[in-house]
């Protein structure tokens, strides 16, 4: 995430488990009035979200932003597709990379920067099952080393 970034609202931890993140991009979100209020309240879920390039625009699908409690008939649809704001060069680069086999555009986190909602979008390659097992083994080994080091420091 770039320097001067603000408060992180939501993270997609599952993305780091299921994908190798090769590049990250910062994208603005086109939102309705009640959506930004729900995001500021922290009521957003990125678990099943993904992004696609369509007609030279990037759209995020399945991102759940809960309805705003005080919003009446003007409330938004929680699962509507939302447009992401990126530079044209970035969109062209993402479109070319996403067409390759095994690559996907995955939302990594939503944060507020200077009052605006931003999304960290990752160009990701899917992990195989053995890659996930290997990562879990490495993580467990690091925990064991840290635990042994802590126990040794106590003595």
Swiss-Prot record:
Provide the transmembrane region boundaries: none
Domain of life where this protein originates: Bacteria
Q: What is this protein called?
A: SsrA-binding protein
Could you give a single Gene Ontology term from the biological process aspect?
Answer: trans-translation
| Chain's role | Required for rescue of stalled ribosomes mediated by trans-translation. Binds to transfer-messenger RNA (tmRNA), required for stable association of tmRNA with ribosomes. tmRNA and SmpB together mimic tRNA shape, replacing the anticodon stem-loop with SmpB. tmRNA is encoded by the ssrA gene; the 2 termini fold to resemble tRNA(Ala) and it encodes a 'tag peptide', a short internal open reading frame. During trans-translation Ala-aminoacylated tmRNA acts like a tRNA, entering the A-site of stalled ribosomes, displacing the stalled mRNA.
Q: Which UniProt keywords apply?
A: Cytoplasm, RNA-binding
GO cellular component, alphabetical, reads:
cytosol
The organism is Bacillus cereus (strain AH187)
The UniProt similarity line reads: Belongs to the SmpB family.
Q: Does the keyword RNA-binding apply?
A: yes
Which gene name does the record give?
A: smpB
Family annotation (InterPro entries): SmpB, SsrA-bd_prot, SsrA-bd_prot_CS
């Amino acid at each position: 995430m770039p320097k001067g970034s603000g408060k992180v609202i939501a993270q997609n931890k599952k993305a780091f488990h299921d994908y190798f993140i090769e590049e990250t991009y910062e994208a603005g979100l086109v939102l309705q009035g009640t959506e930004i209020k729900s995001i500021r309240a922290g009521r957003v879920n990125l678990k099943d979200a993904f992004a696609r390039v369509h007609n030279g625009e990037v759209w995020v699908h399945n991102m759940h932003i809960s309805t705003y409690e005080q919003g009446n008939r003007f409330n938004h649809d929680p699962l509507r597709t939302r447009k992401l704001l990126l530079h044209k060069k970035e969109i062209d680069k993402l479109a070319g990379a996403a067409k390759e086999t095994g690559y996907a555009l995955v939302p990594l986190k939503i944060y507020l920067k200077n009052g605006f909602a931003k999304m960290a979008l990752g160009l990701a390659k899917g992990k195989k099952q053995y890659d996930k097992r290997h990562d879990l083994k490495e993580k467990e080994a690091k925990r064991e080393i840290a635990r042994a080091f802590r126990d040794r420091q106590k003595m």
